[in-house]
Amino acid sequence: MAGLHSRLTTFLLLLLSALPAIAAAAPSSGCGKGPTLRNGQTVTTNINGKSRRYTVRLPDNYNQNNPYRLIFLWHPLGSSMQKIIQGEDPNRGGVLPYYGLPPLDTSKSAIYVVPDGLNAGWANQNGEDVSFFDNILQTVSDGLCIDTNLVFSTGFSYGGGMSFSLACSRANKVRAVAVISGAQLSGCAGGNDPVAYYAQHGTSDGVLNVAMGRQLRDRFVRNNGCQPANGEVQPGSGGRSTRVEYQGCQQGKDVVWVVHGGDHNPSQRDPGQNDPFAPRNTWEFFSRFN
């Protein structure tokens, strides 16, 4: 009987560990109130004496009583808020509008924020871009209904570096990040707390070498208590993406690494595929957390 009880307990623990990361919703102060921000609105604010801008995208039929997930989308160096909103030709290394995420959000579960960088980037001098994030999060939390446990961040290149910076400094605010071909470009204040972490990088990246992406990944493999992989996986035939799901991570602190044979490209496709895999992988990762 004791053996049966032990096996049953082990089975239940394994079953629970396989379930999606579900936490109680944490409705923001803007829930239950009329919205003070409208769909497509560009907001101007002041951070350390500098004028900053961001645009908000609300789902169709926004419901002030429904706590939405909030997703920050950071542009790469030389790009802009407007180029993330409108998109650029993915066949020439550009990004789909809003990084291709809204069409995958079939349940209309997310609000998107697209910030505009200083000098078209995220140098984050003296933490000013993290302060910008704090300002946006507070304004959106007060003016719209979000689940403050479901705040996410993604970006390509410099935008990936900014998402990594938030994973370091705002682990208590950000549920998960997706770093697309990123590097440590925007600093890493703190950097010792666990955050769910997705990253992808190309082995032929001539702008930010794949080793830079691996370095960022390894920080959160350690922080999240995951078992290190045995060696580095390589892209598949024809440069096809290869995916590693790290094992042994803390509950809800998953780490996923995708490596491909391409260059510095946010819209990399696998051979024979029409659509880039970053949007699908990012949305799948963020959707794990409810």
Swiss-Prot record:
InterPro entries: AB_hydrolase_fold, FaeB/C/D. Its main location: secreted. Residues 260-280 are annotated as: Disordered. Its EC number is 3.1.1.73. PANTHER family: FERULOYL ESTERASE D, PTHR38050. It is found in: Secreted. It comes from the Eukaryota. Belongs to the serine esterase family. GO terms for biological process: xylan catabolic process. It comes from Neurospora crassa (strain ATCC 24698 / 74-OR23-1A / CBS 708.71 / DSM 1257 / FGSC 987). One of its GO terms (cellular component) is extracellular region. GO terms for molecular function: feruloyl esterase activity. SUPFAM superfamilies: alpha/beta-Hydrolases. The keyword Magnesium does not apply. It catalyses: feruloyl-polysaccharide + H2O = ferulate + polysaccharide. Involved in degradation of plant cell walls. Hydrolyzes the feruloyl-arabinose ester bond in arabinoxylans as well as the feruloyl-galactose and feruloyl-arabinose ester bonds in pectin. Active against methyl esters of ferulate (MFA), sinapate (MSA), caffeate (MCA) and p-coumarate (MpCA). Keywords: Carbohydrate metabolism, Hydrolase, Polysaccharide degradation, Secreted, Serine esterase, Signal, Xylan degradation. Residues 1-25 form the signal peptide. This is Feruloyl esterase D.
